[in-house]
């Protein structure tokens, strides 16, 4: 193993994932990005940023615990950035169970894998303004209470609090 930091980015083909991969590559990281098996992933953002050839793309599915564990075990990343999600609010109303399984339980699967493989792996969980939902004060800040109004918002709020719980419980 080299001293190069390794990062795993779920959702690397999205806007945030693409720009994060570019930043980490510029900082000298070895970057792994995930794509769902069988999905017709669009790599246009990664191509536009001229980083696709420098990213190790891995088949990955937040629904499959064993796949998550094997991926983390084989890469042994120093950092994991969980940007993947079923993020379309209207779809979350049509498919609330799938949305929750991907966003909420998918996060738990990653957290539990980190706990069993290497508790020193740093973990970032992406959030969304949808977690605030119905707000009384604008703008929101760290004191604004969550009041999600969609299955998507609820699932991301669950992921947020699960991340806090794991950090506080398994420090």
Where do the language-model regions lie?
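N-terminal Rossmann-like NAD(P)+-binding domain of SDR-like oxidoreductases, especially those catalyzing
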Residues: 1-171
